[in-house]
Amino acid sequence: MGLVPFYPNAVQVPLLHAALAQLKRIGKIRQIIFKCRQPGISTFASGIGGWKTFFFDNVNTFVIAHDKPTVAHIFGMYDTMYDEMSPEVQPERPYYNKGSEMVLSNRSRIHVGEAKNINVGTGRTIHVAHGSEICRWQYLDP
């Protein structure tokens, strides 16, 4: 099938409207989404995170999931967005570690981590947090 343009689906549209309204109202987006399997929420969240990271200076984006393959898969979404950007708007990428870190010329960056590390993400200022498969995280207390 190949790469297709992103058009929000029926599940994503209300989330997008809510995100934009929240951004307008308080200047940031905070959404916790409980969902069924495969409605494209990681794609949606990566799109918002990529927009903020690629087009704004000094944004630290952190992606966390229960295991390395899932984290690498989500990082791949950011990677694809970056690779498909028009060169006219694409920031340079002076540092890149496939599947785990991307540093951009606008001083923004994307890091990833596994939730099985209780200290993951500490010591960083995080502006965009994308947590995936939270029900599978090792250190959650009921």
Label each region the model flagged.
Residues M1-P142:
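Phosphate/NTP-binding elements of NTP-utilizing enzymes
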